[in-house]
Curated annotation (Swiss-Prot):
One of the GO biological process terms: regulation of translational termination
Gene: prfC
HAMAP family, per database record: Rel_fac_3
tr-type G domain boundaries: 11-279
Compartments where found: Cytoplasm
GO terms of molecular function: GTP binding; GTPase activity; guanosine tetraphosphate binding; translation release factor activity, codon nonspecific; translation release factor activity, codon specific
Lineage, uppermost ranks: Bacteria, Pseudomonadati, Pseudomonadota, Gammaproteobacteria, Chromatiales
Domain of life: Bacteria
SUPFAM superfamilies: EF-G C-terminal domain-like, P-loop containing nucleoside triphosphate hydrolases, Translation proteins
Residues that bind GTP: 20-27, 88-92, 142-145
NCBIfam families per record: prfC, PRK00741.1, small_GTP
Protein name: Peptide chain release factor 3
Length: 542
């Protein structure tokens, strides 16, 4: 691999995720991007779910049943001399942690907004995450073929609620029953709306210029209204500023109808033109540039049983620098171990292929036999640890109840493997034999029970447990920590990675315990793999 070849491959890559509130049309837009990219021939539209076609990115059985995305899928496809890596994030609020980690693996994000509902709660939370990292954001305002809010009101709401300047690059001509198409402001071109569903790509007539006589023929009285509106928009809105976009301060805005394949091509064309290629990444010791010749990357997700026939676990790794070549040896820095990585996968939703090479920005999958954790770094020898991949304290807890005591071993294996994915956390109290599951949303418990039954043949239920929150515990004084461990044993547990955790029965109890033990640190967040928060090492099982 020459430096020139590496730079050429880096410049080709665009890695992004789609963020939205549930039902804004994220999964449909994902399908249509794949359709325009030539990655699929038939879009599994939402309406056709009952006819046994499901969205390509919703590959897990439970997702197909419920019609929601609960895991992050990875899809790669070529488009206009670029390689697009699209990470589909969970649409359900209960899976925010998985989405948060996915957003650490991308270089930009596409925000989808329902034109009728405007900025919704989940979008606000996801944008906060993007703002922390100054992630460049493109915006697609969807469902223009239905009645919705006025476009100017939507832009105002985005600016006011999300705190990001809007630069419209396309503008709708009417909406709902009066929706006639979009005007491309920078190209001075009208693209007329022609509704198409599923796998058909119909371009619709394109007309150059607002004063074109053909426009009057087609739109009649709507032309003057459109001319006035466009003049107002051009005078009042922010012009597109690429530097402000790359700094996460301004978002280019596009309008369309994903269900009808309309406005998607303009969005995709602008995305490959404006979105950044892979960017430098922070580690605990230094910044790693993608053009460095030596390979490095980090694991942001683990998925169990992507292939139910093989009971496998796949670790998803974002390549940060250099290139992966089949069969190369890599250093697993957390374990200080050299490993030969022979069978690496690339993804198209549930479909997988063997990867011969991979470049910065690409997402590849390693087979994980229980040694890889979320946040782990792999390099060609250097002791690096990529940072910024958090683990949050869960907010809901349940005691796991096994219906068949003979399946105890299978239950433990299933819970350990599923908790490695990071959507739920398993806690084993120091006293007794309970297994306590922690999550940030109720749906996660349903998902675990469903997957235990279908993937591990384990039937389980849940009991309530007197735990309101968890805190990871650390202390620089090992003698004092051992004393705390003895005296607070009734409320202590080990998490899936062996870290000591305080399971607080009430908020008052937590406050009193923290007052009573000032030398002990209680952490609501810990970094994956590092086991460090605010400079304090989190203690593994002692």
């Amino acid at each position: 691999m020459s430096p020139t070849e590496l730079i050429r491959e880096i410049e080709k890559r665009r890695t992004f995720a789609i963020i939205s509130h549930p039902d804004a049309g994220k999964t449909t837009l994902t399908e249509k991007l794949l359709l325009f990219g030539g990655a699929i021939q038939l879009a599994g539209t939402v309406k056709s779910r009952k006819a046994s076609r499901h969205a390509t990115s919703d590959w897990m059985e439970l997702e197909k049943q419920r019609g929601i995305s609960v895991t992050s899928s990875v899809m790669q496809f070529p488009y206009k001399d670029r390689i697009i890596n699209l990470l589909d994030t969970p649409g359900h609020a209960d899976f925010s942690e998985d989405t948060y980690r996915t957003l650490t693996a991308v270089d930009s994000a596409l925000m989808v907004i329902d034109s009728a509902k405007g900025v919704e709660e989940r979008t606000i939370k996801l944008m906060e995450v993007c703002r922390l990292r100054n992630t460049p954001i493109l915006t697609f305002i969807n469902k223009l073929d239905r009645e919705g809010q006025e476009p100017i009101e939507l832009l105002d709401e985005i600016e006011r609620v999300l705190g990001i300047r809007c630069a419209p690059l396309t503008w709708p001509i009417g909406m709902g029953k009066r929706f006639k198409g979009i005007f491309h402001l920078s190209h001075n071109r009208i693209h007329l709306f022609s509704p198409t569903h599923g796998g058909k790509i119909k371009t619709g007539e394109q007309i150059q210029g607002l004063d074109n006589p053909r426009l009057s023929e087609l739109l009649g009285n709507q032309v003057e209204e459109l001319q006035e509106e466009i003049a107002l928009v051009q005078g009042a809105s922010h012009p597109f500023d690429k530097e402000a976009f790359l700094a996460g301060e301004q978002t280019p805005v596009f309008f369309g109808s994903a269900m009808n394949n309309f406005g998607v091509e303009e969005l995709l064309d602008a995305y490959v033109e404006y979105a950044p290629s892979p960017r430098a990444r922070e580690t605990a010791t230094r910044r790693v540039a993608p053009k460095e010749l030596k390979f490095s990357g980090f694991v942001f997700k683990i998925q169990a049983n992507m292939d139910p026939q093989h009971r496998d676990r796949i670790a998803f790794l974002r390549v940060c620098s250099g290139s992966y070549q089949k069969g190369m040896k890599l250093r697993h820095t957390r374990l200080g171990r050299e490993v030969q990585i022979a069978n690496v996968l690339t993804f198209m939703a549930g479909e997988r292929e063997q990867a011969e090479t991979a470049w910065p920005g690409d997402i590849i999958g390693f087979h994980n036999h229980g040694t890889i954790q979320i946040g782990d770094t792999f390099t060609q020898g250097e002791e690096l640890q990529f940072t910024g991949i958090p683990h949050f304290a869960p907010e809901l807890f349940r005691r796991v109840r096994l219906k068949d005591p003979l399946r105890t071993k299978a239950l433990l294996k299933g819970l350990q493997q599923l908790s490695e994915e990071g959507a739920t956390q398993l806690f084993r109290p120091l006293l007794g034999n309970d297994l306590i599951l922690g999550a940030v949303g109720v749906l996660q418990f349903d998902v675990v029970a469903h997957r235990l039954k279908h993937e591990y043949s384990v039937d389980c239920g849940y009991d309530s447990v007197q735990v309101v929150t968890a805190r990871w515990v650390s202390c620089n004084d090992s003698r004092r920590l051992e004393e705390f461990r003895t005296k607070a044993a009734a409320h202590l547990a080990l998490d899936g990675a062996g870290n000591l955790t305080y399971l607080a029965p009430t908020r008052v109890n937590l406050d009193l315990t923290m007052e009573r033990w000032p030398e002990v640190a209680f952490h609501a967040i810990r970094e994956h793999a590092l086991g460090v928060e605010d400079g304090n090492p989190l203690v593994a099982s002692l």
